Every structure is written in C-alpha cells, then in structure tokens.
Amino acid sequence: MPGTDVWDTPVVDGHVHIFKTDMPLVGNPRHRPTYSFTAEDLINTLDRHGVSLAVIAAASPWGDYNDYVVASLRQHKRLRGTVILQPTVERVVLDDMAAAGVIGVRLPFINNPQVPDVTTFEYRRFLKRLADLDWHVHIHIEGEKLPAILPALEASGVKLVIDHLGRPEPKQGVNSDGFHAMLKSVERGRTWVKVSGGYRLGPQSAEFARELVKQAGPERLVWASDCPFVGEEKHVTYQQTIDWLNACVPDAAVRRKIVCDTPLRLYFS
C-alpha cells in the first residue's frame, strides 16, 4: 500500500482505461484486449490503492465509440473522462457529453504515419468549441512530432495535456527537440504533462520524469497509472506505478501537488 506521506490528501489517477469485450474495435487496432476491464473493476482497483478519483482516457482501439465511457461517467461521479471524436462533431453532442462528466478530447496520433492537419477549418472550429467548453485536448504522439503540432494546438486557445512524459525520443531524451518544445509549451501556461507510462518508455523513464519535474514544476504535472496496462498486463501492477512515482519524485510535498493539487484543479474544479 502507498505510504501515508503520499496519500494524505485525495489522490487523482489522471489516466486509466475501461473497456468491454463486446465493444467494436477499429480496423487494425494497436491493441486487441481479450478481456474486459469495467468501470467496476477500475473502482475496485482505485479503492484497493487508496485512490479517490480518476480520469478515463479514451483508447484508440475503440475509436469514437464512446458510449461505455460516457455511460460510466454518468454512473460514477468520482470519474471524469476524455473521448475520441471526429472534428465535425456538433456542439450539442459536446454539451451532452459535458453534462455526463467528459472534460476533454483525446487525439490518439501515436504511430500515425500521417498526422491529421489540425490547421484545417474543421479542426480549428472543433478546437474553438473545446476551448469554449473549457475542455482540454489530450494528445498522445511521438515526442519528435511535438514541435510540428504544438503551435497550431496552442494557437486555438484550448488547454493541452501531453501523454506519458511527452514520449521523448530514446537516444536524445531530455535533450531532444520534442522535449524542449514541450517544456516551452508548458512555460506559456496552457499545457500540462502526465507523469505516466514509465513502463512503456524504457529504463530512461525515471530520468525523463525527474528532469520534467525539475524543468516544468509540479503545478503543470499530473500523475497517472495507465491502468490496466494494455499489452503489458503480465509485467506491470498498479502498485509498481505508485512505486515508480515515489522513486522519480522523492519529495513528498512535490508528490502531493502532482497527485492531488494540480489534477484536482485541472480535472475536477
């Protein structure tokens, strides 16, 4: 169990997934889980680890099938969530989702050979609607692609949340153009980064996280488990993600900001 020096305030897990085996998959999905991880499974996992609140991240294998996530948000008020949407979605749909507890849109651009052009009218209209709702854009993309896409996203005025430490390019890491572009975006005041996904980033992940905390500060960082660790379920546990955070952020006061203060303001205020 986590130490009381960490969990002495409400803890927010900023990135989890839920899904069921009967949900329709997109063609050629990145992952194809053969099991369900329901909202109830998630709640039980959170409770076992003393975590109060969580944010469901829309997952690319199910594309814009958001029905189960939205229904779960309506049922469980301790959850918030992001969805995957086409940029042509109407405002009335966004309003209905907002009432359910949706607070953002995920752009799952990772492993996408042709990243969508977010400067088109459809995307600019879409991003303006998200900004008007005070939602955030939650982007998952390779670090080396951040310098090209961040300016257009920032110009829209929408809040940005970048997944998994910005996924720095492994060889250059914190010295890469992508990592520097992410830090510059954070400095401009509308961007946050998730301290998450270390198990997906190799042995350098702790170094990336420590440098991010040092450069960005805990006021712009949120912790996340990435539960249930799709594709790595046999090798990663929830407790290990907590232990990784403790190792990366040894200062208890800084950890409290990353697991409580910052995500509460960003997701639940």
Task: Cite the ranges covered by each PLM segment.
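Mid-to-C-terminal alpha-helical segments outside catalytic/metal-binding sites
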Residues: 1-12, 35-53, 217-219, 234-269
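Hydrophobic faces of well-ordered beta-strands that scaffold small-molecule active sites
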Residues: 12-16, 54-57, 80-83, 103-107, ...
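Conserved, mostly hydrophobic/aromatic
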Residues: 15, 46, 69, 97, ...
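Active-site environment of divalent metal-dependent phosphoester hydrolases
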Residues: 19-21, 61-64, 88-89, 112-113, ...
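Alpha-helical scaffold segments that flank or form the walls of functional sites
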Residues: 29-75, 95
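A general structural detector for well-ordered alpha-helical segments in enzyme core domains, enriched
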Residues: 41-45, 65-72, 93-97, 122-129, ...
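Active-site gating/metal-coordination segments in enzymes
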Residues: 63-144, 187, 192, 197-198
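Catalytic pocket-lining loop regions of alpha/beta-barrel enzymes
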Residues: 119-223
